[in-house]
UniProtKB/Swiss-Prot annotation:
The keyword Methyltransferase does not apply. The gene is OPG105. Its EC number is 2.7.7.6. This is DNA-directed RNA polymerase 147 kDa polypeptide. One of its GO terms (biological process) is DNA-templated transcription. It comes from Vaccinia virus (strain Ankara). Coiled coil: none annotated. The lineage of its organism: Viruses, Varidnaviria, Bamfordvirae, Nucleocytoviricota, Pokkesviricetes.
Length: 1286
C-alpha cells in the first residue's frame, strides 16, 4: 500500500450517491432483498456479501440508495451552515446583501487578505432592505423551526420550502464563494434525487427480547426503515426531513432524548471509532488468575495447558518452513490450513477426508497449538505505564493459572490474591519480531525516567539476601549446594572456607566498582538490605551491573540471585512466629500500663483546664489552639510508644540476635517501629483527611460517650493495641476511616484515569527529533531532550558535591557553582538539592588507583574541559547550557576525592560519547513516556493518601492529586494562594492585620442589652487577652464595631463610647435607635452582631506567620518569615510597603506580571511539589508538560487544543463527532503526522525506539557549521587586531 501523506475531507456529491446501483424500495421482504437489510449491502453474521462474495473480514460493505422523488432534504448537521449563508443573501432575489450595488467583475482571487476583509465588511453589512432595484424587498430572517421541522420566516413563522433555499444557494456564483467562506458547491448540503443507505457493517444486529420472543435488529436499521417507508409513501418534505433528522441527530429537534442515532454512535467515549477502529475485541486472547512460579525466569511466562491447547499460532509456508509444516501435518498437529490460491480456510479434524485442498505453496499458512518459547504479550490492568504490558517467552506450566516470575510483580503492581492478567498471541510475524525486542523484559529493565531497574526481589527473597550476606564459615559443598545449578562454574581459588560475601562476588561476576558499595566486584558495604536487591532503587546491584555492561547482565543477575535466594531459604529455612513478635507478655503489659497511665494524666489535665474555664479562673484558648495542644499531648504518647519499641528492638537484638522478625526489619522488608506500635502498643489517633472525626448529633461521634464529651477517645484515639483487641467503639472508629478510604479509592481511580487520558492525549505527539531536541509537529519545545540528549533510562541521579576549599580546582568549581546554583535552591528557598543529574552512571567505571599511577591533575582538568567544550559545540550546538555536566565531572572526579588512571578517565569519556551517539534515537516518544510516568505516579499517590502542608488553622495548601489537577486545568478567575516571604516580620504583620478575618464573636465578648427611655444600650465587654491573642489592638476592635454599625441600614441613630473596665477588660458601649419596626430590627441586629462586626477578608482560615531557615547558598542560610494568603489579584497588595518582601504569586498572576516563560517555570515547580518528597526525578516530565502547556503566548489547559490545533481524526478519535463534519464542510486538507491519523491510514507513526538508524537534514547542519565557523573566524580576527593594537 502506498504511504498516504495527506488527507482531504469533503461532502458527498449527489452524483456519487446516485452512482450506486443497489436500490432500496421495500420496507419488509421475505428474503430482505430491496430492504435496508439487503444482503447486497455487505457481509453479515457469517453470510457472504451478495455484491462482492467476500466474508465479513474482507468486505467493507456497499452503499445503497432510496429515491426521494425530487424532494430537497437538508443534511441535518448543516442546518446552521444554511442559516449562516441565508443571512448573507436576499431570499427574494438571491443577490448578496450589501450597503451599495456591487459588480460581478471583481476577481477575488487576486485580492490580498486585507483587501478581501475590507470588501467583506462593505458588502456583507447589515441593511434593512435589498439594494437590487428590481427587488427592493425587506431582508427576511430565516430560522429552523424544531416544531414544524422546516425552515420558517422568523417574522411571520411561514414555511420556506427547501427547494427555494436550494435554488437560491446554488445560484451564488463561484467567484463569491471566498467572500462567504463557501468551500464547495452548496448543493452538497442537500439530498435531492436519492438518499444514501449505509452498508450493514456500521449497524450490526443487536439481540433483545420482547414478549418472550427474541428479536434481532439495530436502531439505525429501524430508523432507515422509517425513511424508506416515508419515501415510498411520497410523504411531505417535513415528514421525510424529520425521519432523516431522527436518523442523523435527534438532538437537533428534541432535547430530552438519548435514542441511538448516527450522532450518538460517533460521539462520546463509546463512539464507534474508538470501539471498532482504534481498539477492538481480538481473538487469540486469554485471561486467567495469576500465580507465582519459582521455575520460570523474569523473561518467561507460564501458560496452563487449557490456554496452550486453545490458542493457535500461524506458520507461513516458505522454502525454510515447508519441511517443518509437512512434519506437523504428518503428526496431526495442524488445526487449520489456509490455501491462498483458493482463498479457503480448512479446519483439519481427525478422520476428516481432505481432497485437493492442501498444496503447501508459498503464502499458504497453517495454524498449530501455541508452542513453548513463542513470544506472547501479557499484562495486568490498569495499564498505567509500559511495564504493565510486556512480551515474554511461553513456558508450559501445571495447574490452571497463568504463572509469572515474582521478579516482575512490582512493575505490574500485581499480587497473588486473585489478580487476573490477559494475554494476546499476535499473528503477524513482523509484530512478533517487534514485540520480542521492544517489549521484552530485558529491554525494559531500566525505568524510562528514574533509571533504576523495574524488576527485583520481593518479600522473603529480601530477607534471604540479608541473611546470605551475613553467613560465615561455609565449606565448598555448602556453597555449591546454595548455588545449585549455577555452581558449576564456581572457582574456590584454593580457599576452604567461604562467606556470603564470596557468593555475592561470584553472582556479580564483574570487576565493578562503586564508591562505598563495590570494589572489584566485591561488596564492601556492612550489610545487604532491600536497597541492593529490590526494584526501583538506585543502589540495586542489577542496575549497577547493567550500567557497567548491559541490561542482559542486569537481568541475569536478577534471575541468578532470585534462584540462589530461594535455594538458601529452602535449605536454611525462614519463618516468623507470634513468639518472635511477642516472646512474652511482659513488654506489652508494661506498654499497656504506661499508655493507660499517660492517657489518664492527659484526660485529667484536660478536665482541669475545662473546669477552670467554666469557673472563669482562666481565659479559654481558641478552638484551633485547644485542639492543637490536645493533639500534641496525644502525639507525645504515640512517640513514647515508638521510643519504647525502638529500645525494645535494640535490646532484643542484643539478647536474641537471631530473632527473625528483627532480621526482617534490618533487611528493610516489613515491620518498622510504627507498625509494631499498632500491634503491641496503641492503635493511635484515627483520622479522616488528616483530621480527627467531626462531632455530629449532640456534639459526639458515637453514642458510647456523653453528649458534648471532650474525651480524646471519643474523637477517635484508640488506646488498645491490635494484640489486645479493639472494643466496640474503637472498632467503629477504625471502620469510619476504612469507609472514607474505600470511597476515596473508588472516586479517585475515576478522576485520575480521566486526567491521565487527557495528559496522554495532549503529549502523545511530542517526540525527539534527529538533533536530540523535543518537538511536537514542527514546533520546538525543548533544545535538549532529558537535558543531556541521552536516553532517560541511562541518566543517573548522583550526589551534588558542593564547592570546598580542600578541593583541587576550587576556584573553577566555585565559579561554575555560582553560575548554576539558582537551580539547586528551590521551593521558596526552603530546600537545597542533594542530588543532580549525571548524563550516565560513570561512577561504576571509577577505579581508584595510587598517587604514582594516577593521571596528572592538569591533564585530567584539560581532558574534562576539552570534552565538555567539544560536546557543547558538536552535540548541543552551543544553544543549551551544559555547565551542570562539567560541574559533575569536576567534583566527582576531583583528585582531592579520588585518584584515577589515565585509562579510567579515557574509558569514562569514551562511554560518555557512546551514550550521546547511540542511546537517544530520533523519534523516541518522549511525550507518551513522560505522560505515563506522571499519570502512574499521581494515580498511586491519590490512592495511597492525601498529604497537605500541616499548619494549624492556615490555608491548607492542597498537595497531591487535587492540586495537580487544578494546575493542569488552569482555571481562570479563581483565588490563588499567594506566598509572602521576608526577613522583616513587621512587613508581613501589616498585611496579616488587614487580610486576616477576625470577627467580634472570636473575642468571646460578654454582650448585654438594656433599654433606656429613648434608646437601646449595648455593652460589649472584651477580655484584652483575646485581643492580644488575635494579634490586633483595641482600636481595631472599636473600628470593627463602628464600621458595622455605620453601614447598617436598620440603625437610625447611634453613638459609641469606650471605657477601660479594669486591667483585664475593655467595654464598648453602643447607643442605638432603630428604624421601624424597632423590635424586629433590634432582634436582627443582636443576632448578627458577633459575626458581622469583623475585619479582613471573609475566610475560615487564619493567616499565621511561620519562620523557617532559607538558603541563599549551600553554606549560607538566614531566618525567613513566611505567610500564605488567598487573593484574587495581586493589586490587593498594592497599598502595602513590600520592599524586600518576596511575593510568590499563583500561575495566572505570574503570567500576567512576568510572562509566559515565568509561568512555565512556576507550573513545572508547582506540579513537582504536588508529588511530595522523594520524587525529584519527575522534574523532567513536569518540565516537559509545563513547556507544552506554555508553548504559545498564553498558558493552555490540558483540556484544550487552541494552539497547535489537533488533527480532525484525533478529535474524532477522542469523541468529537463534529470534527469530521466541520472538516468536510470546510474541505480541510491535513498531513498524516500524528498518532491518531497514522492509525487510520496504516502509516507507521513518526516515532522510533533508539535502536534503528535515523536520518537528519545534513544540509541544515552544514549551514549551521559554516555560520559558526564564520562567526569564530571573524571573532579571532577581531581578537588579533585588538592584540596588534595593544
Amino acid at each position: 500500500m502506498a504511504v498516504i501523506s495527506k488527507v482531504t475531507y469533503s461532502l458527498y456529491d449527489q452524483k456519487e450517491i446516485n452512482a450506486t446501483d443497489i436500490i432500496i424500495s421495500h420496507v419488509k421482504n421475505d428474503d430482505d432483498i430491496g430492504t435496508v437489510k439487503d444482503g447486497r449491502l455487505g457481509a453479515m453474521d457469517g453470510a457472504l456479501c451478495k455484491t462482492c462474495g467476500k466474508t465479513e473480514l474482507e468486505c467493507f460493505g456497499h452503499w445503497g440508495k432510496v429515491s426521494i422523488y425530487k424532494t430537497h432534504i437538508v443534511k441535518p448537521e448543516f442546518i446552521s451552515e444554511i442559516i449562516r449563508l441565508l443571512n448573507y443573501i436576499c431570499i427574494h432575489c438571491g443577490l448578496l446583501r450589501s450597503r451599495e450595488p456591487y459588480s460581478d467583475d471583481i476577481n477575488l482571487k487576486e485580492l490580498s487578505g486585507h483587501a478581501l476583509r475590507r470588501l467583506k465588511d462593505k458588502i456583507l453589512s447589515k441593511k434593512k432592505s435589498c439594494w437590487n432595484s428590481e427587488c427592493m424587498q425587506p431582508y427576511q430572517k430565516i430560522t429552523f423551526s424544531k416544531k414544524k421541522v422546516c425552515f420558517v420566516n422568523k417574522l411571520d413563522d411561514i414555511n420556506v420550502p427547501n427547494s427555494l433555499i436550494y435554488q437560491k444557494l446554488i445560484s451564488i456564483h463561484e467567484k463569491f464563494w471566498p467572500l462567504l467562506e463557501i468551500h464547495q458547491y452548496p448543493a452538497n448540503l442537500f439530498y435531492t434525487d436519492y438518499f444514501p443507505i449505509p452498508p450493514l457493517i456500521i449497524r450490526p444486529a443487536i439481540s433483545f427480547w420482547i414478549d418472550s420472543i427474541p428479536k434481532e435488529t439495530n436502531e439505525l436499521t429501524y430508523l432507515l426503515g422509517m425513511i424508506v417507508k416515508n419515501c415510498n409513501l411520497n410523504a411531505d418534505e417535513q415528514v421525510i426531513q424529520k425521519a432523516v433528522i431522527e436518523y442523523d441527530d435527534i438532538k437537533i429537534i428534541s432535547n430530552n432524548t438519548s435514542s441511538i442515532n448516527l450522532s450518538y454512535i460517533t460521539s462520546g467515549k463509546n463512539n464507534m471509532i474508538r470501539s471498532y477502529i482504534v481498539a477492538r475485541r481480538k481473538d487469540q486472547t486469554a485471561r486467567s488468575v495469576i500465580g507465582p512460579s519459582t521455575s520460570i525466569t523474569v523473561n518467561e511466562v507460564g501458560m496452563p495447558a487449557y490456554i496452550r491447547n486453545t490458542l493457535t499460532e500461524k506458520i507461513f509456508v516458505n522454502a525454510f518452513t515447508v519441511d517443518k509444516v509437512k512434519q506437523l501435518l504428518a503428526s496431526n498437529q495442524v488445526k487449520f490450513y489456509f490455501n491462498k490460491r483458493l482463498n479457503q480456510l480448512t479446519r483439519i479434524r481427525q478422520g476428516k477426508f481432505i481432497k485437493n485442498k492442501i498444496h503447501l505453496l508459498p503464502g499458504d499458512w497453517v495454524e498449530v497449538a501455541v508452542q513453548e518459547y513463542t513470544s506472547i504479550i501479557f499484562g495486568r490492568q490498569p495499564s498505567l505505564h509500559r511495564y504493565n504490558v510486556i512480551a515474554s517467552s511461553i513456558r508450559a506450566t501445571e495447574g490452571d493459572t497463568i504463572k509469572i516470575s515474582p521478579g516482575i510483580v512490582n512493575s505490574q503492581n500485581a499480587d497473588f490474591d486473585g489478580d487476573e492478567e490477559w494475554m494476546i498471541l499476535e499473528q503477524n510475524p513482523k509484530a512478533v519480531i517487534e514485540q520480542s525486542i521492544l517489549m521484552y523484559p530485558t529491554t525494559l529493565l531500566k525505568h524510562d525516567i528514574h533509571g533504576a531497574p523495574v524488576y527485583g526481589s520481593i518479600q522473603d527473597e529480601i530477607v534471604a539476601a540479608y541473611s546470605l550476606f551475613r553467613i560465615q564459615d561455609l565449606c565448598l559443598d555448602e556453597v555449591l549446594n546454595i548455588l545449585g545449578k549455577y555452581g558449576r562454574e564456581f572457582d574456590p581459588k584454593g580457599k576452604c572456607k567461604f562467606s556470603g560475601k564470596d557468593i555475592y562476588t561470584y553472582l556479580i561476576g564483574e570487576k565493578i566498582n562503586y564508591p562505598g558499595l563495590l570494589k572489584d566486584g566485591e561488596i564492601i558495604a556492612n550489610d545487604v538490605d532491600s536497597n541492593f536487591v529490590v526494584a526501583m532503587r538506585h543502589l540495586s546491584l542489577a542496575g549497577l551491573l547493567s550500567d557497567h555492561k548491559s541490561n542482559v547482565e542486569g537481568i541475569n543477575f536478577i534471575i541468578k540471585s532470585s534462584y540462589v535466594f530461594k535455594r538458601y531459604l529452602s535449605i536454611y529455612g525462614f519463618g516468623v512466629t507470634f513468639k518472635d513478635l511477642r516472646p512474652n507478655s511482659t513488654f506489652t503489659n508494661k506498654l499497656e500500663a504506661i499508655n493507660v497511665e499517660k492517657i489518664e494524666l492527659i484526660k485529667e489535665a484536660y478536665a482541669k483546664y475545662l473546669n477552670d474555664v467554666r469557673d472563669g479562673k482562666i481565659v479559654p484558648l481558641s478552638k484551633a489552639l485547644e485542639a492543637d495542644y490536645v493533639e500534641s499531648m496525644l502525639s507525645n504518647l504515640t512517640n513514647l510508644n515508638i521510643r519504647e519499641i525502638e529500645e525494645h528492638m535494640r535490646q532484643t537484638l542484643i539478647d536474641d540476635p537471631d530473632n527473625n522478625l528483627l532480621k526482617m526489619a534490618k533487611a528493610g522488608y516489613k515491620v518498622n517501629p510504627t507498625e509494631l506500635m499498632y500491634i503491641l502498643g496503641t492503635y493511635g489517633q484515627q483520622r479522616i483527611d488528616g483530621e480527627p472525626a467531626e462531632t455530629r448529633v449532640l456534639g459526639r461521634v458515637l453514642p458510647y460517650y456523653l453528649p458534648d464529651s471532650k474525651d480524646p477517645e471519643g474523637r477517635g484515639y484508640i488506646l488498645n493495641s491490635l494484640t489486645k483487641g479493639l472494643t466496640g467503639s474503637q472498632y467503629y472508629f477504625s471502620m469510619l476511616v476504612a469507609r472514607s478510604q474505600s470511597t476515596d479509592i473508588v472516586c479517585e481511580t475515576s478522576r485520575t484515569g480521566t486526567l491521565a487520558r487527557k495528559i496522554i492525549k495532549k503529549m502523545e505527539d511530542m517526540v525527539v527529533d534527529g538533533y536530540g531536541q523535543v518537538v511536537i509537529g514542527n514546533t520546538l519545545i525543548k533544545y535538549a531532550a532529558n537535558y543531556t540528549k541521552i536516553l532517560g533510562s541511562v541518566c543517573k541521579p548522583v550526589d551534588l558535591i558542593y564547592p570546598d576549599e580542600s578541593m583541587t580546582w576550587y576556584l573553577e568549581i566555585s565559579a561554575l557553582w555560582n553560575k548554576i546554583k539558582q537551580g539547586f535552591v528551590y521551593s521558596q528557598k526552603q530546600k537545597l538539592a542533594k542530588k543532580t543529574l549525571a548524563p550516565f552512571n560513570f561512577l561504576v567505571f571509577v577505579k581508584p588507583t595510587t598517587e604514582d599511577n594516577a593521571i596528572k591533575v592538569k591533564d585530567l582538568y584539560d581532558m574534562i574541559h576539552n570534552v565538555i567544550d567539544d560536546v557543547r559545540e558538536k552535540y548541543f550546538f552551543t544553544v543549551s547550557n551544559i555547565d551542570f555536566m562539567e560541574y559533575i565531572f569536576l567534583t566527582h572526579l576531583n583528585p582531592s576525592r579520588i585518584r584515577i588512571t589515565k585509562e579510567t578517565a579515557i574509558t569514562i569519556f569514551e562511554k560518555f560519547y557512546e551514550k550521546l551517539n547511540y542511546t537517544l534515537g530520533g523519534g523516541t516518544p518522549i511525550g507518551i513516556i513522560s505522560a505515563q510516568v506522571l499519570s502512574e505516579k499521581f494515580t498511586q499517590q491519590a490512592l495511597s493518601s492525601f498529604h497537605t502542608t500541616e499548619k494549624s488553622g492556615a490555608v491548607k495548601q492542597k498537595l497531591g492529586f487535587n492540586e495537580f489537577n487544578n494546575l493542569t486545568n488552569l482555571s481562570k478567575n479563581k483565588t490563588e494562594i499567594i506566598t509572602l516571604v521576608s526577613d522583616d516580620i513587621s512587613k508581613l504583620q501589616s498585611v496579616k492585620i488587614n487580610f486576616e478575618f477576625v470577627c467580634l464573636g472570636e473575642l468571646n465578648p460578654n454582650i448585654t442589652l438594656r433599654k433606656e427611655t429613648d434608646r437601646y444600650v449595648v455593652d460589649i465587654i472584651v477580655n484584652r487577652l483575646y485581643i492580644k491573642r488575635a494579634e490586633i489592638t483595641e482600636l481595631v476592635v472599636e473600628y470593627m464595631i463602628e464600621r458595622f454599625i455605620s453601614f447598617s441600614v436598620i440603625v437610625k441613630e447611634w453613638g459609641m463610647e469606650t471605657f477601660i473596665e479594669d486591667e483585664d477588660n475593655i467595654r464598648f458601649t453602643v447607643y442605638l435607635n432603630f428604624v421601624e419596626p424597632e423590635e424586629l430590627n433590634l432582634s436582627k441586629f443582636m443576632m448578627v452582631l458577633p459575626g458581622a462586626a469583623n475585619k479582613g477578608k471573609i475566610s475560615k482560615f487564619k493567616i499565621p506567620i511561620s519562620d523557617y531557615t532559607g538558603y541563599d547558598d549551600f553554606n549560607q542560610t538566614k531566618k525567613l518569615n513566611k505567610m500564605t494568603v488567598e487573593l484574587m489579584n495581586l493589586k490587593e497588595l498594592g497599598s502595602f510597603d513590600l520592599e524586600n518582601v518576596n511575593v510568590y504569586p499563583g500561575v495566572w498572576n505570574t503570567y500576567d506580571i512576568f510572562g509566559i516563560e515565568a509561568a512555565r517555570e512556576y507550573l513545572c515547580e508547582a506540579m513537582l511539589n504536588t508529588y511530595g518528597e522523594g520524587f525529584d526525578y519527575l522534574y523532567q516530565p513536569c518540565d516537559l508538560l509545563a513547556s507544552l502547556l506554555c508553548a504559545s503566548y498564553e498558558p493552555e489547559s490540558v483540556n484544550k487544543f487552541k494552539f497547535g490545533a489537533a488533527s480532525t481524526l484525533k478529535r474524532a478519535t477522542f469523541g468529537d463527532n463534529k470534527a469530521l463534519l466541520n472538516a468536510a464542510l470546510h474541505k480541510k486538507s491535513e498531513p498524516i503526522n500524528d498518532n491518531s491519523s497514522c492509525h487510520f491510514f496504516s502509516k507507521v507513526p513518526n516515532i522510533g525506539t533508539g535502536y534503528y538508524k535515523y536520518f537528519i537534514d545534513l544540509g541544515l547542519l552544514m549551514r549551521m557549521e559554516r555560520k559558526l565557523s564564520d562567526k569564530i573566524s571573524s571573532q579571532k580576527i577581531k581578537e588579533m587586531e585588538e592584540t596588534e593594537d595593544f
